[in-house]
């Protein structure tokens, strides 16, 4: 146990004070120009949560046109290109004289089964996913002396949403297409896709392992029963710190032995507890700790990241050493104006789509590499990562989000403990049905970001809950600047990573 005497360098700003909000130089809200406070207005706040009339919805993917022809024959339905969703059975059985067997076999016209036009959606409703940069080729001029990165479009033929009115229909459908499914099955491929090979694939290093150059910190609260991020780093034999609160010291001590990770973990007990202001305060304290040990950068992670991946040649494969972190460190340290970087979420990079190796000037989340001389610090109770990145970008500096390296982050609110228990509330309460939004749910955390940056942020209703939308387009003018004397060689450098095809570690 390590109990360093590290004092907080500044009082934490949770951004809940009205006067501080008005004095915030990075917000350009109307209250700066009008007398009196301007209360926030929720965007589309009267929109009700749509109740699905389906018992279940199943996403069915097809690799080829012939696969879809066979599927249509099996379920006896024609699903032309302009149909995105359909019912099974197509007509309500109660309105038919006979059950499932009264259908005349249909003739499937393959020419009508062409794929839908690619549509990346309404970018005005984009939620921190910058699709515009997918085909950006400028990244290639900077991806030098870095690991191989080849990622091309290899998209599936089409996806159809199949809706079921009740369990009986779902079970009949399962028999018809010859696939075993449960009520928890959300998506399938037809024919059934045998996904087995990636389980045995890993990026490994032979001999001495490469370690990250800069210290790593995990901010953790009430997750001593899972410790996903720490277990992942320990499996890669990477030493790291876990910042915890005093009242949970014993539980985390026991967890180190329970999970067999003590050799790689240093517990740091923060000088505060149960403050209710989110992880930003602990992140600032970890920042102070890294400076106290002479570090020039530091990594800070959420505590629910199960694995880290390398994306290359249309495969997302786990890496089992610190080489991926070292490559990211080396890349950003070439530039004089990059202050924050980190890997993209795994679920935002489909293996069959084209992405650049990195995207500059967007939000970095959950796993951040931060330059210690950055003049900004964490603040706010919610969405601190987006706020920190926006302040850096508004200064004309840069952030770098890697697609070549990914993090296997658990979905928001899906893992118990952490901030979920403290102030993130479920969005399925009765208040949504009655009022259209839950005042105690994700709307508060999204609204805070709108208050912080009303010039580039607004509130939107998506996926049955509130989200924030951020326009990163104004920051595309922020250009990466090499440090004087930096001139990377135009060569491939895989940092000793070798693809193991039969990993059993």
Give the positions of each predicted feature.
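Compositionally biased, non-globular sequence tracts
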Residues: 2-207
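A solvent-exposed, charged loop/short amphipathic helix patch at secondary-structure junctions
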Residues: 305-323, 415-432
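Short, aromatic/basic amphipathic alpha-helical patches
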Residues: 72-77, 174-179, 229-234, 251-261, ...
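A structural signal for short, well-ordered beta-strand segments and their strand-loop junctions
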Residues: 242, 297-301, 339-344, 399-403, ...
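Short, well-formed alpha-helical segments that are part of the catalytic scaffolds
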Residues: 212-238, 244, 248-256
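C-terminal catalytic/acceptor-binding lobe
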Residues: 207-215, 221-225, 380, 386-505
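Conserved catalytic core of nucleotide-sugar-dependent glycosyltransferases
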Residues: 308-391
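Active-site-proximal specificity loops/subdomain of glycosyltransferases
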Residues: 244-301, 306-320
């Amino acid at each position: 146990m390590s109990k360093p005497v590290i004092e907080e360098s500044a009082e934490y700003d949770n951004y809940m004070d009205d006067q501080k909000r008005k004095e915030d130089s990075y917000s350009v809200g109307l209250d700066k120009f009008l007398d009196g406070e301007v209360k926030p207005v929720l965007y589309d706040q009267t929109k009700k949560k749509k109740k699905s009339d389906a018992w279940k919805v199943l996403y069915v993917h097809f690799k080829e046109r012939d696969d879809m022809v066979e599927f249509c024959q099996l379920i006896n339905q024609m699903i032309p290109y302009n149909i995105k969703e359909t019912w099974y059975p197509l007509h309500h059985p109660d309105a038919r004289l006979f059950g499932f067997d009264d259908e005349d076999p249909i003739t499937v016209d393959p020419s009508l089964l062409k794929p839908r036009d690619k549509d990346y959606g309404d970018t005005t409703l984009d939620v921190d996913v910058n699709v515009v940069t997918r085909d950006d080729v400028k990244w290639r001029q900077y991806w030098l002396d870095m690991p191989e990165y080849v990622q091309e479009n290899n998209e599936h033929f089409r996806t159809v949403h199949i809706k079921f009115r009740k369990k009986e229909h779902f079970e009949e459908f399962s028999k018809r297409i010859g696939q075993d499914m449960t009520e928890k099955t959300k998506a399938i491929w037809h024919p059934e896709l045998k996904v087995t090979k990636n389980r045995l694939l890993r990026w490994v290093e032979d001999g001495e392992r490469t370690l990250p150059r800069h210290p790593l910190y995990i901010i953790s609260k009430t997750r001593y029963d899972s410790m996903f991020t720490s277990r992942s780093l320990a499996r890669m034999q990477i030493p790291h710190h876990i910042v915890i609160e005093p009242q949970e010291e014993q539980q985390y001590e026991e967890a180190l032995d329970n999970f067999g990770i003590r050799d790689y973990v240093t517990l740091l007990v923060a000088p505060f507890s149960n403050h209710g202001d989110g992880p930003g305060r602990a992140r600032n304290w970890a920042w102070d700790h890294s400076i106290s040990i002479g570090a020039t950068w530091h990594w800070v992670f959420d505590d629910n990241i199960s694995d880290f991946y390398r994306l290359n040649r249309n495969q997302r494969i786990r890496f089992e050493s610190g080489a991926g972190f070292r490559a990211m460190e080396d890349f950003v340290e070439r530039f004089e104006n990059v202050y924050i970087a980190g890997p993209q979420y795994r679920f935002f990079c489909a293996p069959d789509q084209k992405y650049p190796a990195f995207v500059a000037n967007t939000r970095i989340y959950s796993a951040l590499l931060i330059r210690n001389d950055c003049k900004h610090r964490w603040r706010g109770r919610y969405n601190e990562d987006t706020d920190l990145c926006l302040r850096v970008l508004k200064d004309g500096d840069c952030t770098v989000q890697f697609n070549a390296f990914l993090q296997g982050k658990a979905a928001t609110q899906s893992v118990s403990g952490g901030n979920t228990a403290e102030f993130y509330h479920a969005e399925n309460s009765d208040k949504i049905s009655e009022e259209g939004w839950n005042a105690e749910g994700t709307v508060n955390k999204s609204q805070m970001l709108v208050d912080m940056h009303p010039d580039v942020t607004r509130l939107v209703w998506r996926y049955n809950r509130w989200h924030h939308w951020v326009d990163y387009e104004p920051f595309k003018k922020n250009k990466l600047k090499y440090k004087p004397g930096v001139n990377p060689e135009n060569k491939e450098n895989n940092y000793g990573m070798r693809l193991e095809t039969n990993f059993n570690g």
